[in-house]
Amino acid sequence: MIRHIVFFSAANPDNVERIREALMMLADIPHARHFEVGRNLQSDAIAGARVDLVVYAEFENEAALAAYKAHPIYAECIALVRPLRDQRIAADFKSG
């Protein structure tokens, strides 16, 4: 299984909800076994860094993750989120 984790910070804190709504579009892509978007609780903040939202998804394999990223909804989401975000940090790792 591949675990996919992405951290987002909004360029303007007023846009966090707009970004969250756009990221929720990704839940309609059928290739993920599990998908969720959540607001960071900020309980372990790092000085100089801010994470507003977290995307967490699980995929059966690398092919499923690649299909997810190739889906038209993924491209649509990027077009909506990219102008509103400050940073995006992603990590994928094999589990199990």
Label each region the model flagged.
Residues 69, 78-81:
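Short, flexible helix/strand-to-coil boundary loops that buttress conserved ligand/catalytic motifs
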Residues 28, 73-74, 83:
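Residue-level marker of structural boundaries
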Residues 58-59, 84:
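Conserved catalytic core of Hanks-type protein kinase domains
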Residues 22, 80, 84:
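Residues that form generic nucleotide/phosphate-binding pockets
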Residues 87-91:
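Charged phosphate-binding loop/patch that engages nucleotide di/tri-phosphates or the phosphate backbone
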Residues 17, 75-76:
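Long, contiguous binding/interaction regions
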Residues 1-53, 60-70, 93-96:
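Short S/T/G/P-rich N-terminal loop/turn motif that feeds into the first structured element of a domain
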